């Protein structure tokens, strides 16, 4: 389905990032796996396929994204799909007690990272005349929760950012959409919430399938969507 396509996956060393990488790789794409350290990438991908790239990048730095993604374009000649998977979560204090460091961390990683990657990738997609961008919001983006103000605000910003980009780019055949996962069934989440009913959580592979749909030609008419994918929660 994705033969001949170049797909960039941020946060590729995480559980969801790996699932998305595998989905597109199995579909025949050349996948560029991005994460913040070579050590993480080496751990996530101990056996590397020469068809793909594995690059260290600081997604919170526009300069770092410019350097790495410009080289990807120079090397491969195109970027057809950008999957902005990287993100973070911190349970914090009440809004009025939340530190600047927490606000900066969550907005830089969850929201500004999308701006930073898009600043390089969108001009390339405009030159190509097509492209697909898929962002990760969250079910929590639709409602504020106590002691999660910075997180929910950063993910709500992803939804609005997705809508704005979709409105700006749809006439140039560039689709921008996002998904809103509930609790993802990852080893880290199981460790953090051992008493929870894990059967209600959504597996990364199912999220990857929805992302794959949004990145496919079947979704050419979908712009600015925020799709809930929250398992049985």
Task: Show the residue positions of the predicted features.
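Residue(s) in the substrate-gating loop at a strand-loop-helix junction
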Residues: 138
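Short, small/polar-rich loop/turn modules that mediate ligand/substrate recognition or access, typified
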Residues: 170, 175, 221-224
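C-terminal substrate-recognition "lid" of short-chain dehydrogenase/reductases
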Residues: 205-229
